[in-house]
Every structure is written in C-alpha cells, then in structure tokens.
Amino acid sequence: MKEELLKSWKSRSRENIKKYKIFLNRIDKAKAIRILPVLHQEAFKKINCLDCAACCKNYSPRFKQQDIKRIAKSLNMKERDFELTYLVSDEDHDFVLQSKPCPFLEKDNKCQIYDVRPSDCHRFPYTDEDVFIKQPALTLMNASFCPAVNEVLEKLMEIK
C-alpha cells in the first residue's frame, strides 16, 4: 500500500466514524455476516498489513493462557517470566502488553513471533467474523487505525 493511500484512509476514517456508527446500528446483521468473508478477501487483495502494522503499533491483543504458554515456550521462557517481562493485567483482568508498539514488532513491520502469535493477532481485524458486526464499538475502534476495516465498512455500505 502506498503512503498516499495510508493517508487517504486515515482521513476518510476520521471523517466517517459517525457514519459508520449509524450504519452498524442499522445494518441487517445476518446479511452482513454472510458477505463478510468475500469482502475480507477483496480487502486483503488491496491491503498488505506489512505496509502499515498500525495494529501492532497502537493496539494490544489479549493474551490468553494458551497464548502465553505457546509464546513463552517458543522464547524459551517460563510462563511467569514472560508475563512479568511483557504483560500487565488490564481493567478487565485480561493480560495485555505493557508497552506499545508491540515489543515483537520488527523494523520491517514483521512479527518476531508470527508463527506463535496470540489468537487476537491471528484473528485481527475480525473483518471475516461475526464480531465485526456484533461488536460495533470494537469495529469502530479498529476503524480508527486499520485500513482493512475501513475498506470492508465502505464496501458493506455500498451493498446495503
């Protein structure tokens, strides 16, 4: 994705958040959920996450116990040491990263732990899941920094 495209979606996102919110509250949820996988595929034909990595720079995934176990093992760390080194408990008592950007994000926007990354990272930005429609607050938050979310929302709005 070119730099001008990144700037364009950021501008559109800020302008359209209110419109997206109204749309997500009125949408035919069942119909939208059925077409999300196609829109997801189309969006990721245009968008390369490595051009952006805004999710890794602005967002912390939740680290479930299975994630912690898997990642700690891959780093040859004890689970508790991994937690103490990288994680904190948030207001919902979920483990999240202590800092942003993600400490596993490399300079070229690749992930050091990609093969064992947390399930939230694997699923992000949820554009092919019912969560995208059923949790509009999450979708709107993600729209503030993810071009794929904006792309899927724009295409959904065209279909109605």
Go through the PLM ranges and name each one:
Residues 1-160:
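Short loop/turn segments that flank or connect secondary-structure elements
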